[in-house]
Swiss-Prot record:
It comes from Brucella ovis (strain ATCC 25840 / 63/290 / NCTC 10512). The gene is accD. Component of the acetyl coenzyme A carboxylase (ACC) complex. Biotin carboxylase (BC) catalyzes the carboxylation of biotin on its carrier protein (BCCP) and then the CO(2) group is transferred by the transcarboxylase to acetyl-CoA to form malonyl-CoA. HAMAP family: AcetylCoA_CT_beta. Belongs to the AccD/PCCB family. Acetyl-CoA carboxylase is a heterohexamer composed of biotin carboxyl carrier protein (AccB), biotin carboxylase (AccC) and two subunits each of ACCase subunit alpha (AccA) and ACCase subunit beta (AccD). InterPro entries: AcCoA_carboxyl_beta (IPR034733), Acetyl_CoA_COase_Trfase_b_su (IPR000438), ClpP/crotonase-like_dom_sf (IPR029045), COA_CT_N (IPR011762). The keyword Cell membrane does not apply. GO terms for cellular component: acetate CoA-transferase complex. This is Acetyl-coenzyme A carboxylase carboxyl transferase subunit beta. Keywords: ATP-binding, Cytoplasm, Fatty acid biosynthesis, Fatty acid metabolism, Lipid biosynthesis, Lipid metabolism, Nucleotide-binding, Transferase.
Length: 296
């Protein structure tokens, strides 16, 4: 009886019992409803192979795909006061920060990476929407400025990947202060004669579009990205009119001269490397694909 209880029954249970499946093993395509295996999606830089839909991507994954051989070094996040306003809504702001830090492993919504693309050294500043919607607060603002200062120090071009819902309401006026501060950092980079390329990803809205996200020398948008100051629903409720189809999409903005080109994430590295070589007068690789045609 002991043999049956201790050996046979566990064997049967292991054969017939339900196996635990890891979370997010399959990802649903928001545009078609298709289920995509997570590993297939990751190997394609989180772009749905069949539809081309660009899923949101974490900052460290983006840096890994962007830099040569996935190798880069990150700058230590600057220290700022955590909750100077002692803000509370449904929960304390400081508790919310701790929760996001625990879930994401990040200090705030910005990661600065140093590395090369096709051998060209650059600084990349990446905004991560998974950390409080990529919102711009003191920590994120200080990290953005840190990236610009490092680019100036090393005399490197800076590529910024914007993804944000706007200013961080829990920090009030201290959040809004980051708009002029980051704008000054952009001007410092340009005065140093260094190239500034902005990649607008889904979504890029709110205060970031009123500051550093729209001040680049070249603006590239990922396909299907929502880009604008206020969201379309807010605008429709304000003006009481229906907006044009595709309004505030990256394709709409390129057609109307607000961005220079729309480029798939799969082609971003080659496109940006080619632009860097042209703009910095480096020898171009004739095998690299030409950048997509820019908007008028």
């Amino acid at each position: 009886m002991n043999w049956i209880t201790n050996y046979v029954r566990p064997k049967i249970n292991s054969m017939l019992g339900r196996r635990e499946m890891p979370e997010n093993l399959w990802i649903k395509d928001p545009s078609t409803g298709e289920m995509v295996f997570h590993k297939d999606l990751e190997s394609n830089q989180f772009v749905i192979p069949s539809s081309g839909h660009h899923m949101r991507i974490k900052a460290k994954d983006r840096l890994r795909f962007f830099f040569d051989n996935g190798e880069y070094t990150t700058l230590e996040a600057p220290k700022v006061p955590l909750d100077p306003l002692k803000f509370r809504d449904e929960k304390k702001y400081i508790d919310r920060l701790k929760d996001y830090r625990s879930r994401t492993g990040m200090d705030d919504a910005i990661v600065n990476g140093l590395g090369t693309i096709e051998g060209l050294p650059i600084v990349a500043t990446v905004q991560d929407f998974s950390f409080m919607g990529g919102s711009l607060g003191m920590g994120a603002g200080e990290a953005i400025i840190q990236g610009f200062e490092k680019a100036i120090e090393l005399k490197r071009p800076l590529v910024l990947f914007a993804s944000s819902g706007g200013a961080r309401m829990q920090e009030g006026i201290l959040s809004l202060m980051q708009l002029p501060r980051t704008t000054v950092a952009v001007e410092m980079l340009k005065e140093a004669g260094l190239l500034y390329i902005v990649v607008l990803t889904n979504p890029t809205t709110g205060g970031v579009t009123a500051s550093y996200a729209m001040l680049g020398d070249i603006h590239i948008a990922e396909p299907g990205a929502l880009i604008g100051f206020a969201g379309p629903r807010v605008i429709e409720q304000t003006i009481r009119e229906k907006l044009p189809e595709g309004f505030q999409s990256s394709e709409y903005l390129m057609e109307h001269g607000m961005v220079d080109m729309v480029v798939s994430r799969l082609e971003l590295k080659a496109t940006i490397a080619r632009l860097l070589k042209i703009m910095t007068k480096q020898p171009a690789n004739s095998d690299a694909p030409a950048p997509p045609e820019a908007g008028c």
